[in-house]
């Protein structure tokens, strides 16, 4: 079986969804920009040699509809002979895109794939056109379709206090801002054209979503967003709404060597699981455990974790049940996470994987794990190993 390697991993800056940098930039353009960038950064690869493109996107309608993967590839002037498919596993879409490409390479059906994902939550809102079947309520709690309420449920089940949530959310912003100031995101961010508050065209090379002034004390003043009477989850402890894309160049190890490209990481194992939709945010726990089992590892073997921060109330129970509460500041989301950077749904799986690989290189770490919760009760995880 072929070994699968990551040759390159990049992303756009994360733009605010409400009146942000990319308010006049379409999702296809964000995607095409990264596709072109991967090719220009790796000139040894001819675009015609790409076997397939796998691109995650959740709200596949409006500008994100009609197979955005193919639309973006055409905009990027990738040869018409190269196919492209859009993948949807909700929040895990672009990590699923990576898994799909990896399996194609493992079986020998492909040797080179572009993978990634995008979501423009400013142009295509998360709930646009959503119409749940009424019959779902016979099997699933109605609140299972309301992500904030699933986070509230997890916080109650696991004893996650409002103070713990506020402290974790403040940490996310502080660490993301520190990483920005130190230039730690420069290797992964591809400067991308957008517009400033006055509508002037500008090149963005930083995440505008981060709020460096955030403190736990300030967050403590916010009202509950989803359960006004008894809740603890606020807008400040939830992932920010943002627009962005992320992309990776994935190959068989033998093909990368043939082209003279240096692999940056190898996929050690992959896993996806289901869980109770009412606590959808718990999915990373069984997914991570399964991925670790497949790799013959335990959580203590992993040097660095990137765990998507859908909500502070959601990620903290996952950290607790993976036995990592005492190692948060040594291993988990060291550059902040989605609370600070945002969670463009179809982008996030590739985004956290990209951030993880860059962080592993900077800290000379051998093993890393990226994992996400998924709406309606799923979890997805990938174990990466430095080459």
From Swiss-Prot:
GO terms for biological process: fatty acid beta-oxidation; phenylacetate catabolic process. InterPro entries: FadA, Thiolase, Thiolase-like, Thiolase-like_sf_Thiolase, Thiolase_acyl_enz_int_AS, Thiolase_AS, Thiolase_C, Thiolase_CS. It catalyses: an acyl-CoA + acetyl-CoA = a 3-oxoacyl-CoA + CoA. Pfam families: Thiolase_C, Thiolase_N. The active site is at residues 91, 343, 373. It is found in: Cytoplasm. Pathway: Lipid metabolism; fatty acid beta-oxidation. One of its GO terms (cellular component) is cytoplasm. Keywords: Acyltransferase, Cytoplasm, Fatty acid metabolism, Lipid degradation, Lipid metabolism, Transferase. It is an enzyme of class 2 (transferase). Its EC number is 2.3.1.16. GO terms for molecular function: acetyl-CoA C-acyltransferase activity. Belongs to the thiolase-like superfamily. Thiolase family. Catalyzes the final step of fatty acid oxidation in which acetyl-CoA is released and the CoA ester of a fatty acid two carbons shorter is formed. NCBIfam families: AcCoA-C-Actrans, fadA, PRK08947.1. Heterotetramer of two alpha chains (FadB) and two beta chains (FadA). This is 3-ketoacyl-CoA thiolase.
